[in-house]
Amino acid sequence: WLILDSETRFVLGFHLDRHRDSPQAFTILEAVKPLGSPGAIVSDRYFAYRMPVKTLHGVQHIRVESFHDDITNNLIECFNKQFKAWYKTKQGFSSFASANNLISMFIFFYNFVRPHSALNTLPPAQCAGLKLSKKRKRELLLVA
């Protein structure tokens, strides 16, 4: 489960689980609540989003019906495509914990390091306003 900001492409949160139902959607939405309330949430037609999004009062739920809609979920699908290409090189994960760790590192790279052509070659964190010196970027990379 992922939540991505549509303007900055910053991955706000992820939740790895063995199941993909409404309780997991509740979990990821609760995890990102401290970051603020969005005006809208865009999702595909998967049923598990319905009830969790209804609990976010005042938030519009836009369920993408087709690729020809005015509003699409292309941003998250693009992220998923990049993630799957990276994941295939790993030949699976050795454990649930290692999967969480590796996904966290991928998201760190995606948010803070990887330039995005649609964001004038800035990583999402910089597009969102984070300003880091080159030294601080290197320090964060070493920690990750």
Model-inferred region functions:
Residues 9-14, 89-91:
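Short small-residue beta-strand/loop micro-motif enriched in glycine and branched aliphatics
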Residues 65-85:
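RNase H-like two-metal-ion nuclease catalytic core shared by retroviral integrases
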Residues 3, 9, 41-44, 77, ...:
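Mobile genetic element proteins and their domesticated derivatives, centered on retroelements
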Residues 89-144:
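C-terminal domain-tail junction helix/linker
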Residues 14-35:
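Active-site beta-loop-alpha junctions of metal-dependent nucleic acid enzymes
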Residues 50-57:
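Short, aromatic/basic amphipathic alpha-helical patches
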Residues 57-67:
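Short hydrophobic/aromatic-enriched beta-strand-loop microsegments
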Residues 37-50, 120-125:
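Acidic/histidine-rich, metal-coordinating catalytic segments
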